[in-house]
């Protein structure tokens, strides 16, 4: 005999996340390209997002309206211009997770091939570094005695809570005293980092299947590298390039020799 539905049951059903709605919004190829373009945390104009998605300005506006309505994307006005950014870092992490299970897009041009390779080499994961550059930076911090807690490897057969991508939970990295002194000398003001955000976090990198540095320190260190012009954005959103000064600085400061 079927059990009678109670008010508590209805509340539980009502509060279940509407995964299907979010998935349907992301499933559209044009909207997916726009969301990927926004995954580095920057606010981008509608015109650039239209070009990235390969659609007209009117079509892009309609897509962006749906994303704003669903609170996947936020809109900011600056004069007559409208800029869009992801509403939350969690959306970027969700896209990274989908990248693990999604089949690769067919490479139809040299540009597509170059972009895919560049993303694996060095990219942003919302506001911190990922790809081989991000993984290499974390490894250099560990080898230099700036970070402790784990060796940066991801072992799926031993993982308890860590998945193939996204924020990790199995290990507790921490800054050593050497790490604190080094970062302060480098221009990262640890005392002014937002208290609401974990100081140190890590993500499992979807392309490298190792850890890269996240959290307040990961974001602040990445911002400092851009401030020093050791890094610059590429022509495709999220792609990051190491400048000549950056190659020398990363090697001298952190013992990191990026292949870029």
Predicted regions and their residues:
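Amphipathic alpha-helical dimerization/coiled-coil segments
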Residues: 2-18, 40, 93-152, 185-220, ...
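Beta-hairpin "wing" of winged helix-turn-helix
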Residues: 68-78, 82-85, 150-151, 234-235
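Minor-groove-contacting beta-hairpin "wing" of winged helix-turn-helix DNA-binding domains
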Residues: 80-86, 156-159, 172-175, 238-243
């Amino acid at each position: 005999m079927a059990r009678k539905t109670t008010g508590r049951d209805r509340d539980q059903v009502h509060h279940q996340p509407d995964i299907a709605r979010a998935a349907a919004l992301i499933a559209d190829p044009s909207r997916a390209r726009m969301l990927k373009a926004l995954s580095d945390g920057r606010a981008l104009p509608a015109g650039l997002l239209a070009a990235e998605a390969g659609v007209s300005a009117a079509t892009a506006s309609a897509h962006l309206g749906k994303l704003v309505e669903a609170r996947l994307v936020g809109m900011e006005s600056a004069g007559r211009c409208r800029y869009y950014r992801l509403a939350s870092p969690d959306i970027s992490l969700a896209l990274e997770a989908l990248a693990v299970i999604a089949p690769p897009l067919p490479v139809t041009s040299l540009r597509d091939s170059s972009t895919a390779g560049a993303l694996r080499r060095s990219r942003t994961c919302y506001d911190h570094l990922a790809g081989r550059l991000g993984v290499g930076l974390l490894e250099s911090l560990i080898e230099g005695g700036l970070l402790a807690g784990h060796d940066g490897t991801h072992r799926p057969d031993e993982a308890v809570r860590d998945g193939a991508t996204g924020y990790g939970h199995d290990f507790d990295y921490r800054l050593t005293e050497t790490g604190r002194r080094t970062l302060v000398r480098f221009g990262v003001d640890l005392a002014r980092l937002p208290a609401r955000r974990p100081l140190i976090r890590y993500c499992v990198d979807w392309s490298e299947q190792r850890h890269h540095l996240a959290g307040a320190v990961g974001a602040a260190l990445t911002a400092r590298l851009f401030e020093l012009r050791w890094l610059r954005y590429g022509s495709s959103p999220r792609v990051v390039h190491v400048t000549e000064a950056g190659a020398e600085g990363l090697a001298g400061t952190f013992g990191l020799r990026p292949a870029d």
